[in-house]
Amino acid sequence: MGNKKIVLAYSGGLDTSVAVKWLTDKGFDVIAACMDVGEGKDLNFIHDKALQVGAVESVVLDCKAEFAEIFVGAALKGNLMYENKYPLVSALSRPLIAKKLVKVAKEKGATAIAHGCTGKGNDQVRFEVAIHSLAPELEVIAPVREWHWAREEEIEYANQNGVPIPADLDNPYSIDMNLWGRAIEAGVLENPWNTCPEDAFFMTNSVEDAPNEPEFIEVEFKEGLPIALNGKIMELHEIIKEVNIIAGKHGVGRIDHIENRLVGIKSREFYECPAAITLLKAHKDLEDLTFVRELAHFKPVLENELANLIYNGLWFNPATKALIAYLDETQKVVNGIVRIKLYKGLATPIGRKSTNSLYSEKLATYTAADEFDQAAAVGFIKLWGLPTQVNAQVNLK
């Protein structure tokens, strides 16, 4: 009887490379699976390295389009920002990665899935809750959480077992990156008084180094999702990639956040999210043009709930599914074009138009072209204020 098969979420870094050897020693045949969600890594290198360190099979899946359309798409439709600051960069990718891990496990006949998360962060929760939501029968193993090694011990184990040490191991920061942005933590950032050194950034210029002239872009939306950039029809993941480059050049999207983690601690996180910040602002601006007042006022309440659900690893919870269905209904009118000014760290919508626009210049103008019936205001004010007036008559004695 052969070894049991396990699918490992493989990144090519030290932790998951050591995990291949560690799991092999535990009696597993390791199938390494790497999901490309736009982190810009050399996937051929990762594929080959997995085999080099002992995986019996290496699988690389291009998930950029699905990640953009389904997961980032929901974030855009919902204007999702955890604690009104963090656009859910890592949190959005975890359920997709978990979904693909389960798919590979079922296709390969694996009985377990492994990930490289520590026991201190949010991602362990996101992965394991998602996996058990999709395949309760699968065992989940977290080698890094189990072995409790210091970094020096891990390096010693790697050297003893012929596991290559990554060239960037001396990088003091912990980095996670995908299409929607880049998360930076650890190192000097663990002291919340310290500013983030410029060498930690990759996607964005500093405001000081950003161009001294503004740049203008136009984003076209259809039912809440971008479909064109500067008049060119593109796939959503292509639009995001291009806006990351353009807005990042102008220093847009740097976020310094003291974050309340799911596991109960506060963490200090830096994010680079040029496309996320730019497209979220454009999307919200178009909603302001096309939503009735009641929807514009109510939707943010549910947006906050949905952001919390996704941050907390509950993408596959029925509540999340219901709220995303609500978002889809609201977005039917969010069609049009938004013009955005990019300059010195700011993405500012400066123009918008839509066939679903509820703005009427004839009603809003103060010129002779005004069609608003101002005489009707007298009766409206009387009825609108009637409850307050009655309360005053009864209680102000």
Curated annotation (Swiss-Prot):
It comes from the Bacteria. ATP binds at A9, Y10, S11, G12, G13, L14, D15, T16, S17, G116. GO terms for biological process: argininosuccinate metabolic process; L-arginine biosynthetic process; urea cycle. Gene3D superfamilies: Argininosuccinate synthetase, chain A, domain 2 (3.90.1260.10), HUPs (3.40.50.620), Single helix bin (1.20.5.470). InterPro entries: Arginosuc_syn_C, Arginosuc_syn_N, Arginosuc_synth, Arginosuc_synth_CS, Arginosuc_synth_type_1_subfam, AS_cat/multimer_dom_body, Rossmann-like_a/b/a_fold. It catalyses: L-citrulline + L-aspartate + ATP = 2-(N(omega)-L-arginino)succinate + AMP + diphosphate + H(+). One of its GO terms (molecular function) is ATP binding. Disulfide bonds: none annotated. This is Argininosuccinate synthase. It comes from Lactococcus lactis subsp. cremoris (strain MG1363).
